[in-house]
């Protein structure tokens, strides 16, 4: 099943940019998923197991590099057209 997940990471620290960029780079390093970064959130598309595995790995990376964070996640069981408006890292 193809899913689209919208992720917004909010590190609970002053130096938050590094944690967010590391989180996005970790997602982008995973195989079998597509990652689209927008101004306020990042979209991940792919097979359910691949998307969930990529999020788990990225969360472990964020957990090691921050003092705490909040991850707001929305998941839909559809291939949403989120390609327009994304930012390159």
Q: Where are the model-predicted features located?
A:
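Charge-rich, low-complexity N-terminal segments
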Residues: 1-89
């Amino acid at each position: 099943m193809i899913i689209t997940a919208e992720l917004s990471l909010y590190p609970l620290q002053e130096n938050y940019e590094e944690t967010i960029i590391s989180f996005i780079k970790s997602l982008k390093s995973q195989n079998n998923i597509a990652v689209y970064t927008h101004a306020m959130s990042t979209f991940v598309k792919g097979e359910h197991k691949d998307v969930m595995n990529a999020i788990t790995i990225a969360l472990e990376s964020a957990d090691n590099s921050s003092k705490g964070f909040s991850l707001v996640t929305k998941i839909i069981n559809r291939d949403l057209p989120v390609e327009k408006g994304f930012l390159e890292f």
